[in-house]
Amino acid sequence: MGASEMDARADVAVIGGGLSGVTAALRAASQGRDVVLVRRGYGATATGCGALDVLGASPCESLGLMTCAHHDPVHALGSLLKRLPAHPYAMLAEGPAEAWPAFRARFDAASDFLLDHLAKAGLAVSGRLDALTAHATTHGTLRLTNLAPLAVHRGDVAGLREARVALLGVEGVSVFDPAFVGRSLEAILARERPEALSAAAHRAVRIPWARAAGGILPVEIARDLDDAERREVFAEEVARSLDGGSFTHAILAPVLGLERHAEVLELLSRRLGIPVSEPLVPPPHAIHGLRMQKALDRAIAGSRVRLVSARVTGAEIAGRRIVALEGEGDGGAVKIRADRFVLATGRFAGGGLTGRGTVRESIFGLPVFHRAKPLGDRAVFNLLRPGYFARQPLFDAGIRADSELRPLDADGRAAYENLLAAGTILGGYDLALDGTGPGVDLLTGFTAGEHAAAT
């Protein structure tokens, strides 16, 4: 190959650098395998809200706080698999009778593994499979989930009792309006848990170095707070804004650092002496997702996994085995040879599926399914239904896999002997409606990494 071309060799090659791909790569590497992870850039993980729904409530449903108190994960899993038999969880459940014990064991192993890596990379994540927590959002709503970054988890409103909450905005950062969110929170809790809140006050924090005009993005201030001197100034301003108040909790604008988020959170918690949290932020300003992606990057950098920045355009194939990936990087052509491959490219946001005219898997030409039936040449516009919140066939379409996570061909056989799939490239569920997207990433990524290391 030419001087500007790259030819790499590994035991396992993972395509995709989001939650599922990184989990698969880290797991395979932890089993002693030589792993290459190839990605072209950030995908859906970096733009997600940061909540890790496993058996959570749909973000599109209007569910009250009683949902948290009465969450039954065994029933939730059984109901999900009955309603969505092609859901990826069905591949991990080992049959109806063993569904919950097998799923619980798999979740415990996967979550312990990933959360340990994230914590070491500077992002603490908290929560449980058997509980839902409720968190304020910048839209003034509540978002229920299983796992969340510590900065969000500390603000679980389902656990408040006689709380005196200070909501602190930052001058110029219009994404978070503390007065609006505070009034909304008071109204919701007055209806559903009147004992939760005794007072809510809103304040504004002035940042001396920020421009006076509005339109400042949360990530701009977050990057500023990665600097130690500016962190100290910010902590002083926050403490000053709370003078004269007696508060038990503080919800701050979602600006508490990017690369040094843990240090910012620890400093403020220590300085204020009360739990400090942030609201969840939907896209496009979803800083929690960007922090998670940065933490995944640091986890990869601290592991034995080799990262290759390239766009995979195709593969060298011999019979029913993949020999190598072919792609384009900044320095020219890239070829990555491996014994086993993991496809974790996501759906439309990550580039795993393309949807111009018909829906296609973008690298291997794998068939795309809806409800266990291949879409073939079915036009995209025939996969859409009236109604904004209607279940859209297009949005739960994806590839299918067997119990070992090997993608299937149109006849239901493993398409390739040495290819596995993980994450949202797998169909059978709707990311917006079913409250399981990150759980699928975590569980299938972990499992695919184990299978890739073992075979």
Per-segment meaning from a language model:
Residues 26, 49, 350-362, 416-417, ...:
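A conserved FAD-binding loop/helix module that cradles the flavin
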Residues 13-15, 36-38, 312, 335-346:
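Short hydrophobic core segments
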Residues 10-37:
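N-terminal Rossmann-like FAD-binding beta1-loop-alpha1 element of flavoenzymes
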Residues 314-335, 341:
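Conserved beta-strand-loop-beta-strand element in the redox core of flavoprotein oxidoreductases
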Residues 257, 332, 370-377, 383-437:
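FAD-binding beta-loop-beta segment adjacent to the flavin cofactor pocket
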Residues 182-192, 228-250, 257-315:
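Helical element adjacent to the flavin cofactor pocket in flavoenzyme catalytic cores
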Residues 41, 331, 338-340, 344-351, ...:
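Glycine-/small-residue-rich beta->alpha transition segments that form the dinucleotide
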Residues 40-83, 209-221:
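Conserved N-terminal glycine-rich FAD pyrophosphate-binding loop of Rossmann-like flavoproteins
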